[in-house]
Amino acid sequence: MTKKELALIEQYAKSLVEVAIEKDFLNALKEDVYAILETMKASNLDKILSSLAYAPDDKANLVRLLKDSSSVYVNNFLDVVLQNQREYLLFDMLKTVLKEIAQETNTYDVTVTSAIPLTEEQKNRVISVVMSKFGIQTGRLIETIDASIIGGFIISVNNQVIDTSIKRQLHDFKMKLI
């Protein structure tokens, strides 16, 4: 991705978030963006929009389908994206919108990777640790199961990581022996 495209993505995302703040629409925007991103991932629409194999008119029609379940501000945003033929950047724009909202509200999604599923009590403890350690509010708790970490967990939030996995501890021990 070029610097120009990154700048465009940032500008579009910031503009949408600024409108949402001005209109007191931030939480609804966040829900709309999550829904659209999930739809795009599930249908591979993100790959279709960035592919040169599809005609621009076909891409525009697919983006218009997303407007059916969205708010008026998101629909206006999608219209601007289509008018400027930037649909190939839409997926990244929406991900950047979520990052902008997180920064604005100091609320971040927390990703927890563990070898086995966490209980509700463990999830609550993870949330309280994140809130106290990083001084932020938690959004969604995204749980990932990865048996290769053997035990412990890896918490990742706002580009910061707490890794207490057995796999990392064994790796650290191995490096000390070498």
Curated annotation (Swiss-Prot):
GO molecular function: proton-transporting ATP synthase activity, rotational mechanism
Pfam families reported in the protein's UniProt record: OSCP
Keyword Membrane: yes
Keyword Transport: yes
InterPro entries in alphabetical order: ATP_synth_OSCP/delta_N_sf (IPR026015), ATPase_OSCP/dsu (IPR000711)
Compartment(s): Cell membrane
Membrane-topology annotation of the record: Peripheral membrane protein
Gene Ontology CC: one annotated term: proton-transporting ATP synthase complex
Top-level division of the source organism's lineage: Bacteria
Keywords linked to the UniProt accession: ATP synthesis, Cell membrane, CF(1), Hydrogen ion transport, Ion transport, Membrane, Transport
HAMAP family: ATP_synth_delta_bact
Physiological role: F(1)F(0) ATP synthase produces ATP from ADP in the presence of a proton or sodium gradient. F-type ATPases consist of two structural domains, F(1) containing the extramembraneous catalytic core and F(0) containing the membrane proton channel, linked together by a central stalk and a peripheral stalk. During catalysis, ATP synthesis in the catalytic domain of F(1) is coupled via a rotary mechanism of the central stalk subunits to proton translocation. This protein is part of the stalk that links CF(0) to CF(1). It either transmits conformational changes from CF(0) to CF(1) or is implicated in proton conduction.
Family that this chain belongs to: Belongs to the ATPase delta chain family.
PANTHER family named in the record: ATP SYNTHASE DELTA CHAIN
Quaternary state and interactors: F-type ATPases have 2 components, F(1) - the catalytic core - and F(0) - the membrane proton channel. F(1) has five subunits: alpha(3), beta(3), gamma(1), delta(1), epsilon(1). F(0) has three main subunits: a(1), b(2) and c(10-14). The alpha and beta chains form an alternating ring which encloses part of the gamma chain. F(1) is attached to F(0) by a central stalk formed by the gamma and epsilon chains, while a peripheral stalk is formed by the delta and b chains.
Protein name (database record): ATP synthase subunit delta
Gene expressing this chain: atpH
